[in-house]
Design a protein with these regions (language model features):
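Ribonuclease/tRNase effector modules and their secretory precursors
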Residues: 1-160
Length: 160
């Protein structure tokens, strides 16, 4: 599995992520679907995804590098789905999701990296992250709902 690398930081301010811009960026994915290579699951991007991704309780709690990582991961949603692993089913327990997740939820692990550049714009290292894709399961299919539990892993210096 190749880890998708975010080469360009669209959202680089760690203090005030412009989540409204992230939401607008994510709207380009609406109506598309992507295949999880490990399971051949087809995951669709519905119109509720951009808002949930940028306005969820999880997102609102994010600060610093993890907030920046989630904002920039919007650029590689397709690759994060493609490379997802460790699928597991979770029963829907929230009444508010009774209809839009009527058959429960799938959670998948995924990984991505952000290139960190030096002062002369050379890539210095990769900051690696793991995350969980939250996917609604309905009779109509699987729909990406959010990306949560983003955790930074050990950075990888580039070899000279």
């Amino acid at each position: 599995m190749l880890t998708p690398i975010i080469e360009k930081n669209f959202f680089f301010n760690k203090q005030n992520i412009p989540w409204n811009e992230v939401e607008i960026y994510l709207k380009q994915y609406i109506g598309q679907s992507f295949i999880v290579d490990a399971y051949q699951d087809e995951i669709f991007i519905a119109s509720d995804f951009p808002d949930e991704y940028s306005e969820s309780k999880y997102t609102k709690k994010l600060r610093g590098a993890v907030a920046k990582a989630k904002a920039n991961a919007a650029q590689i949603i397709d690759m994060m789905i493609k490379n997802a692993v460790n699928r597991r089913w979770v029963e829907n327990k929230a009444l508010k999701h009774k209809e839009n997740a009527s058959e429960g939820w799938y959670r998948y692990d995924t990984y991505f990296a952000i290139a960190v550049k030096g002062s002369n714009e050379d890539q210095v290292r990769l900051n690696r992250y793991r995350a969980t894709l939250v996917v609604r399961k309905t009779p109509k299919g699987l729909f990406l709902y959010d990306v949560v539990d983003i955790k930074k892993e050990a950075s990888t210096p580039l070899e000279s």
